[in-house]
Amino acid sequence: MGQKINPLGFRLGTTQSHHSLWFAQPKKYSEGLEEDKKIRDCIKNYVQKNIRISSGMEGIARIEIQKRIDLIQIIIYMGFPKLLIEDKPRRVEELRMNVQKELNCVNRKLNIAITRISNPYGDPNILAEFIAGQLKNRVSFRKAMKKAIELTEQANTKGIQVQIAGRIDGKEIARVEWIREGRVPLQTIEAKIDYCSYTVRTIYGVLGIKIWIFVDEA
């Protein structure tokens, strides 16, 4: 059997960069890691509760966290930031207060910035959310996959592979279905590949969605 390494970790330092930028003493490292998870969960929960697009997408591509002794800087990369910035100062301030309360950080300043990504459907996380929304609405998985590929073609990517695993269309036996368009060179370290694995709960059970997008060659 072929062993598949995570494409993002495989390319760290060449075409991929870390989403958390900070240093810690070895004993304090686990605390910093837990803090990062709390921040990301808190932001995602807030966005889920307060924002609803028709398809039920959050539109968060990634959350970058930079920490200094007296400051935590959070950058949220979103595909559709209008949803969070309709009444911008109030929403962002409310989100900042929520995160601060969750972390209970009194002696550190917390900044939140929101950045729009130019091609939302060129990002695997947003695409996975789109497919998940379609599957929840009982759209056939093939139709959902093809629609996702159409959207990425508009985003100017060089190749995409989509895989869905589980009880597809409510069938008794779980199986894996996949579709590929263009080139997806997973073995080439210089190839910039974005990857995402996403879990969606449907009425038939849990489905796993994996997406590989070949963006460009370094």
Swiss-Prot record:
GO CC annotation terms, alphabetical: chloroplast; cytosolic small ribosomal subunit
- Location of the KH type-2 domain: 47-118
Q: Mind telling me which InterPro entries this protein's record contains?
A: KH_dom-like_a/b (IPR015946), KH_dom_type_2 (IPR004044), KH_sf_prok-type (IPR009019), Ribosomal_S3_C_sf (IPR036419), Ribosomal_uS3_bac-typ (IPR005704), Ribosomal_uS3_C (IPR001351), Ribosomal_uS3_CS (IPR018280)
Looking at the UniProt entry, the stretches that span the membrane are none
A GO biological process of this protein is: translation
Q: Name one GO molecular function term.
A: rRNA binding
Keywords recorded for this protein, A-Z: Chloroplast, Plastid, Ribonucleoprotein, Ribosomal protein, RNA-binding, rRNA-binding
Subcellular localization is given as: Plastid, Chloroplast
Where mainly located?
A: plastid
Look up keyword Plastid and say if it applies.
Answer: yes
PROSITE patterns in the record:
KH_TYPE_2, RIBOSOMAL_S3
Pfam families recorded for this chain? Ribosomal_S3_C
Family, according to the entry, reads as follows:
Belongs to the universal ribosomal protein uS3 family.
Assembly and binders: Part of the 30S ribosomal subunit.
> What protein am I looking at?
Small ribosomal subunit protein uS3c
Q: Which organism is it from?
A: Barbarea verna (Land cress)
